Amino acid sequence: VKVRIFDIQNLAVAYICLWATSPMLAFGTVYRLAAVAAVGVWAILEMFRPGGIFTRPTLPVLLTGFFILYTAATEALLGADQNFGWHIQIWIMLFFLVFYESRRDDVRSMSSMFWFLLATLPIWYFLTYTAFDQYGTHTARLLTRTSDFAREVSSDGVGGYSLVYSIVAVLPAVALLLLNYRRFVPLEQPRWLTPISRIPLIVPALITANLVLGFALVVRAGFSIAIILMIFSLALSLIFKRRSPLMLMMLPLFMMLAWLAFQIALVPFLQMIAPLTEGTPYYRKVLDVIETLQNDQSQGTLDDRVERYMRSLALFVQNPIFGVISDRDVGKHSAYLDTYARYGVLVGSVFVYLLTYLPVRMMRGMKDNFGLAFSILSIMVLLPLLNDVFASLGVMLFIMVPVACDLVERARVRGPTAPRRRLAVRWGPRVRPAGARAARMSGPESGRA
């Protein structure tokens, strides 16, 4: 059996992806050390691979190295009492950017990891969704910080903030995959999945499971920003196909409509359909979602967020060049604003570039599915601006989204599949119309002797 370097690297990165997305592996020193070892294996193999990314690094790779070294050196100088958890999440996320850069000319080589993740993610979606019945609708919020409860629940496969927001990042691509699955099934890559993909409806069933369970989990988790971003990004990816100045002009209008729909229409709509579900298993679930959304809107979370955003912005204005370095007074609710406040304009701009580089690159290359690339860019602008980032975001942005876009674009190039021939029963000889027979005789063959 011939084993390529790519195959060993794919196995290593597949474990890192599983570790970043699986709640069961979120805690545990052994799991973390295994992830670090997997990163080391990939990096060593990449160093010795002909044409590896380290021999000819691209600009995003160089900036990633600069960002990691600068932030790591700063934290080391400040001492061990600083919060390393936030940085570790970002460094792991940026590792996937480096991995993507090593495969960006051969995106199909990441297909095995894509389908592996597409098969495992519904497991965590389902376990987290069903956990709401046992622990309550605020379970995802309680898992945002390390605690004994978080360790116990995560060991059962229940995810929290990072799982919910990772769904938002990948859901537009999953939706377009479902609409175009007939054009790339059976799968060409990886080849070992080709026979399995020929099983009727197995691929659309897998994509549908990710779409339906992911959508339901985001709604029931009750994160206001996640719901708004999900609806907004899905609308962009499904409505807009080609590049259009009108689309850019209508973008503020769509954002306003999404916000108004959430603030005004969503809760009344759920209250309207709640009586229709009475007597079914969904009645209690609908009431839980209504209660969660009403509590979220009444607890003053918006005012608290705005105060934290303004705190980080004020620190940046006071120290625009080098930042305040320490995270003591930073708002800690916006990845972009916090980075600008801590490290200044240069490092903050590098961070924004690294998270928006890939969506902008896709917007240049995707013509008929421009809305998908634009929706991903919108997510990567708004999500880190309004919240913190996490390791699994790198999995979605730099592995899941590029492979999904490649499948959708490949469907456009290949064109629609030819319709199947149907069995036709004739009771007599086929009679050609007189006009068709005359046209056939008047062709170039009719002049031959």
Predicted regions located by residue number:
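Transmembrane alpha-helices of multi-pass inner-membrane enzymes
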Residues: 230-231, 372-384, 389-428
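Transmembrane signal-anchor hairpin modules in multi-pass inner-membrane enzymes, especially those
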Residues: 1-73, 105-108, 181-201, 245-249, ...
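A membrane-periplasm/extracellular boundary helix in multi-pass inner-membrane enzymes
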Residues: 212, 216-218, 234-295, 448
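Aromatic-anchored transmembrane helix interface
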Residues: 59-71, 78-126
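Hydrophobic transmembrane alpha-helices and their immediate junctions
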Residues: 342-384, 401
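Long extracytoplasmic/lumenal interhelical loops at the membrane interface
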Residues: 290-346, 362
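Alpha-helical transmembrane segments of multi-pass inner-membrane proteins
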Residues: 110-139, 157-239, 357, 361
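Helix-loop-helix junctions and helix-breaking kinks within/between transmembrane helices
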Residues: 23-35, 80-85, 197-242, 263-267, ...
